[in-house]
């Protein structure tokens, strides 16, 4: 990739409002074909979330233009917990949990076509004396204390364990530069202090690459309330489809306001800027159609969950919101619905049972819905309370109830 092409790439990141800071644009422009860039992912949960996808999509953008990339799982850093701009100390994970998290996140990252390295490999044979002599000797304590991410925690308390986090992240960078020709590091803007520590380790080394290393950060994608996107409303938007379904992600994106939709489209989609601007223009001319939101939902769900996930999300959306004919609802659709709408298992099925389940508050309310022809079971409109029998079950012993226009339930007869 040429010098000019790298300039154009950086300009596009700025236009998309992805890029926040870069230590040296010139060093990025002079990146050699055998040199690369990495981003770290700590295994603090069994899945990455939408906030992490900003970093994943950045690695994919770099990969697409021919730059070598590496996703680094924090097997070592994850054992400590990053204190950066955190108001309290993070709970330490036990080894069993950490290893289980690592395996799942490794598979997630690999599913996006990214090569993966576990930083635990760097430290597994290093003892405390090695660490103090090789790592600790190369950094000044006053320099570390002056960092904003550390200073903000000093008054409320910061353990030596968390204080060491930036040393390990910094040493990662030096190790990767020395052994894998990874001379660039990227990350969220809250990682700047930790990343610069790595630059300092490299500059003080005897590496031939010591004057070539650089770091750059991305803006943090936030919701309309200024909260990090991965943890909107206190519920992480997981990338694992079993933890946060493609349907829920599709609906989440579909319901973004215009300003947020435009921002997320620029950040998370791989559509050409010209195409995005055309979509924004069309949307502004006919906002009722929500052209921007529909295209955003399609792009992001497809990129994360593939064509299969997108088809499921769109099909469930049709079932729940567009009055799809019951004959078009397959058994697989019902299995997906079980993850999304209230699901019950029963040993018998009748009117009293669905009242006992809380679907209706009383027999009176049930009769009101029936009289207004507002109750369907497996596609059949119920006209009499006595029609609610087990004979309505499908071949899989399932009942799909539609109460009014908005409420759906699945009941399984066992």
Swiss-Prot record:
The name this protein goes by in its record: Tyrosine--tRNA ligase
'KMSKS' region (motif): residue ranges: 228-232
Domain S4 RNA-binding, chain residue ranges per copy: 349-414
Catalysis performed (reactions): tRNA(Tyr) + L-tyrosine + ATP = L-tyrosyl-tRNA(Tyr) + AMP + diphosphate + H(+)
Keyword Cell cycle annotated: no
Gene Ontology BP term (one): tyrosyl-tRNA aminoacylation
Pfam family, one: tRNA-synt_1b
Positions contributing to ATP binding: 231
Protein location: Cytoplasm
Any one of the GO CC terms: cytosol
Annotated residues for binding of L-tyrosine: 38, 165, 169
Enzyme Commission no: 6.1.1.1
Family that this chain belongs to: Belongs to the class-I aminoacyl-tRNA synthetase family. TyrS type 1 subfamily.
Top-level EC class as recorded in UniProt: ligase
Motif 'HIGH' region per record, residues: 43-52
UniProt-listed SUPFAM superfamilies: Alpha-L RNA-binding motif, Nucleotidylyl transferase
The protein's role, per its UniProt record: Catalyzes the attachment of tyrosine to tRNA(Tyr) in a two-step reaction: tyrosine is first activated by ATP to form Tyr-AMP and then transferred to the acceptor end of tRNA(Tyr).
PANTHER family: TYROSINE--TRNA LIGASE, MITOCHONDRIAL (PTHR11766:SF0), TYROSYL-TRNA SYNTHETASE (PTHR11766)
Assembly information from the UniProt record: Homodimer.
GO molecular function: ATP binding; RNA binding; tyrosine-tRNA ligase activity
Keywords (A to Z) from UniProt: Aminoacyl-tRNA synthetase, ATP-binding, Cytoplasm, Ligase, Nucleotide-binding, Protein biosynthesis, RNA-binding
Keyword Cytoplasm: yes
